[in-house]
Amino acid sequence: MKKFGLLACAALFLFLTGCTEDPAPETRVTPTPGRVQVEITALPTATPVPTPTPLFLPRDDKGNLDINQDLENSLEPTSFPLAADTVILLYHTHGEEAFRQEKGYTYKETGESTYKTLETDKSILALGRLLQQELKGMGYTVLHDETDCEPPDIYSAYSRSLQVMEKYPQATVFIDLHRNAANVKEKKDDVVLLDGKRCAKMFFVVGTGIGTRPGEYDIAPDWQQNYLLAKSMTEKLREADPELCGDIRLKVGRYNQHMSPYCMLVELGHNANTFADAANTIPYLARAIGVVLPLLPAEDAP
C-alpha cells in the first residue's frame, strides 16, 4: 500500500510539473485514442525584403554623386519641344567669373579672387550676351538678367540668383551660365578644334537636392528630368566632337533647379582658357539647344 501510494504521488507530481527525464518529442506526438493529434512544425521563415537599389551613390566627400547605372541606361536622350512663346531666362549665379588674361583681353580683378572682374564685357556676362544673340537669331524669346549675385558672399549667391529667377514667372527654361572653377594652375591647351577654331570644353551640373543634412531644402528638384535634359544636351554636343562636353556632374546641392524641369547649369571653359576659346563654343551650345529644345510652330503649340 505504501509503495502504491508513493508511485501515485510521483505520477501526480510529474503530471502537474511536466518534469520528466525523457526528452520531449521533436516533431510529433503519438496519437492516443480520444485525443486530438498535434503536429509540431517549424515556424515559417520570413521572406527577406530586398533593399531597394539607391538612385545614386556618393562618389566622394565633395558632394559628387554617381547615378545608378540601370537608371542611367533607362534615360534615353530625347528632345523636348517647346511652345513658340516659351520664354528662356539666361542668368549667372557667379557673374564675375572671367578667363585667362592675354594681349587684347585684360581686366581689373575684383580683389576678392583672381580670374574675376566687374567689367561685364570681359566676364561670363559677355558670353551670356553672345548666347542670347545666337538663340534670338533662332527664334527663341530670351531674357538675359545680368544681376551680380555674388556680393556680399559668394557662398550665398544661389539664394540671390533664386530671387532673380522668381522675378520672371513667365520663364519656363532657365540657363545658369558659369565658367568652371579657377583651379587650373598653368596655361594649357584644354580645347577642341572645330572648324579651325579653338573651342573651350564644357559640362553640365545637375542638383539632386538631397542636401548635406536632413531638411536642408524644403523643395527638391525634378532632378531626373533635369538629368535627362543635360544628358540629351551632352550627347548632341558630342556629335560635334566627343570631347567638347564632359560628363554630367551630379551633386547633392539643389542649384535652384527645383524651379523647373528645364534647368541647365552650364560650366563653360575654365580659368586657363581664353575668352575667345569660350566664345567659340557658344554657337555649338546654341545649336544643341535648338535640337534638344526645338520650338514648335505657333499653330502646333499646345
Predicted regions mapped to residue ranges:
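Positively charged n-region of N-terminal signal peptides that target proteins for export
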Residues: 1-5
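C-terminal motif of bacterial Sec signal peptides marking the signal peptidase cleavage site
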Residues: 15-18
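Structural recognition of the beta-strand scaffold that forms the well-ordered cores
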Residues: 89-91, 142-144, 173-176, 203-205, ...
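A short, glycine/acidic-enriched catalytic loop
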Residues: 109-114, 182-222
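Active-site-adjacent mobile loop/cap segments within catalytic or ligand-binding domains
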Residues: 243-302
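N-terminal catalytic or cofactor-binding beta/alpha core of small enzyme domains
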Residues: 29-172, 179-190, 279, 283, ...
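Bacterial signal peptide processing site
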Residues: 20-22
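Active-site-adjacent substrate-binding region
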Residues: 222-249
